[in-house]
């Protein structure tokens, strides 16, 4: 049975990805951070192949603890999906002084440094997996060239997601020669899932709709695995 660890799995895209991979017969390890959400526990009660791990991607100690638990549970991992993210305050920019640089740092810790820590900590298990696939959820706001007309954007999320893309590029340089394959995905503007399972009215897409697309992209082989590209929910490539 193939296995995957998914971060930020409490709700939204992460939860939808858990459901998708469970439906495809995978063993799923789900990183849980939000105590006020019990949607993962509801899923675990229906499927014994879902295992919940306490996991704060912004904490090196939490990642190390999760890796230790996983090493006692499974001998290998086939796929890692780095989905957890922190948006940061929307008014954090030079347009709304004083700028909260601590908020910028918190977003960097989760969105850019967290995925690098995840790969480093879970690499021994991934080395023993058959697929060796690393998947990262990024964003259109990570594209530096495309942000030139969006001067009022808050700083934390775009800056940290652009940094994530660079980190993925450096990981690709090192790990592609070791038979690792990579996926970088822009999911679009998704509705927020509430603790009771309902969806917010704002945003465009149901996370279950995007989750099905993302799961196919993450699981299936590409024609050219050597190229590192960022792909959106329509299959279009984005510059980064």
Regions found by a protein language model. Give the residues of each.
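Conserved glycine-rich Rossmann-like NAD(P)H-binding loop of the short-chain dehydrogenase/reductase
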Residues: 24-40
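N-terminal Rossmann NAD(P)H-binding glycine-rich loop of SDR-like oxidoreductase domains
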Residues: 10-20
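C-terminal helical subdomain
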Residues: 177, 184-187, 192, 196-240
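Conserved Rossmann-fold cofactor-binding substructure of NAD(P)-dependent oxidoreductases
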Residues: 58-73
């Amino acid at each position: 049975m193939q296995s995957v660890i998914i971060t930020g799995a409490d709700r939204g895209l992460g939860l939808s990805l858990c459901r998708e991979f469970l439906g495809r017969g995978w063993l799923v390890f789900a990183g849980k951070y939000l105590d006020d959400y019990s949607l993962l526990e509801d899923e675990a009660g229906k499927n014994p192949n879902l295992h919940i791990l306490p996991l704060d991607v912004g904490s090196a100690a939490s990642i190390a603890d999760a890796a230790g638990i996983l090493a006692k549970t499974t001998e290998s991992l086939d796929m890692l999906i780095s989905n957890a993210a922190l948006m940061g305050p929307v008014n954090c920019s030079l347009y709304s002084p004083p700028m909260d640089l601590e908020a910028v740092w918190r977003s960097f810790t989760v969105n850019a440094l967290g995925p690098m820590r995840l790969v480093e900590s879970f690499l021994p298990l991934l080395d023993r997996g058959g697929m060796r696939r690393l998947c990262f959820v990024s964003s259109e706001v990570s594209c530096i060239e495309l942000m030139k007309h969006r001067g009022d954007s808050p700083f934390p999320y775009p800056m940290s997601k652009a940094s994530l893309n660079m980190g993925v590029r450096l990981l690709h340089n090192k790990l592609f020669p070791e038979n690792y394959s990579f996926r970088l995905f822009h999911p679009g503007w998704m509705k927020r899932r509430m603790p009771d399972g309902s969806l917010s009215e704002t945003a465009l897409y149901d996370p279950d709709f995007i989750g099905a697309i993302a799961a196919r992209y993450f699981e299936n082989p590409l024609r050219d695995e050597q190229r590192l590209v960022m792909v959106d929910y329509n299959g279009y490539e984005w510059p980064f």
